[in-house]
Amino acid sequence: MTTRPTSPSVSPPASPPASPAVSPPGTVLLSGIVGSTAYGLAHAGSDIDRLGLFAAPTTGFHGLHRPAESHVSTKPDRTLHEAAKWCRLALSCNPTATELVWLPDELYEVRGPLGEELIAIRRSFLSARGVRNAYLGYATQQFRKLLTRDTSDPAARARAAKHARHLVRLLEQAVHLHEAGHNLVRLPDPERVRALGERIADDPAHAERLLAAATDRLDLPGVLPDHPDERPAEAWLHRVRAAHWTPAPAAAA
C-alpha cells in the first residue's frame, strides 16, 4: 500500500451535523468532509460539505436501466458518486472528486477496506494534462465570475472574494500537484489566501497575473505522467463489483 504523506493536523468542525442514513441503493465505500473545512478556509456560518462514493449492487448493472450514478442531498450537503463515475471524474483530475482521496485522516467519516484500497492507488489517477486542463479550467471559470460581479453591492463583493479564494486555491493545488505529485488539500497558509481573495475582489487584474504565473510553471517539466494509468482503477472496480455481487437464487425445478 502506498505510504500516505503526513498532513498537518486538522481538527474537524465542532459538532458537525450527523450524516443521514445511507440513501443510495448501495454501500458507501469512502466519504469525508470536503470544501472550505478541508481547505482551512471555513468561517462561522460556513456550510459543511460532504463527498463520497458508493458501490451499487452489481446485479443493478445487468438490466435495461443502470443505477443512478450520483445522489445529492441537502441539510447536510452531501454528494455521493457511484464508484465507476467517481473513477471517471478522478481520471480527468476533476478537482472536487480528486480531493476525496487526499483528505487529512480526521476528515474521513467512512473509510472501508475498498476505500483504503482506493486511497492507496490515488497517484495513478493523476496526469499532467489532466491537472492542467481541469484545475486551470476551473480557475479560469472563477476568474470570469469575478469580472461579472458588481462589487459595489456588499453581497456581490463577498461572493467575488469567495470566487477569488477558490481561484487561488485551485492554482496552488495545480502547481503543487504538477511539481510534487501530491494534492495539497489543506492549505498551508489560509490567512494569506483570504487576504489574496480580498485583494483580487478589489483588483481582478491581480488574478490574471496569478493565472499567467501558474500557467508558466505548469508549462515546465513536472513529476506527473502525461496520461493517467487506468489499470489500477480498472482492477479496483472489478474488486468492487465482485464484492457487491449477489447471485440470483436458483429457479425452482
Residue spans for each PLM region:
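Short, surface-exposed loop and linker segments with low hydrophobicity and enrichment for Pro/Ser/Thr
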Residues: P8, P24, R159-K162
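Long, intrinsically disordered low-complexity tandem-repeat segments
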Residues: S7-S11, S15, S19
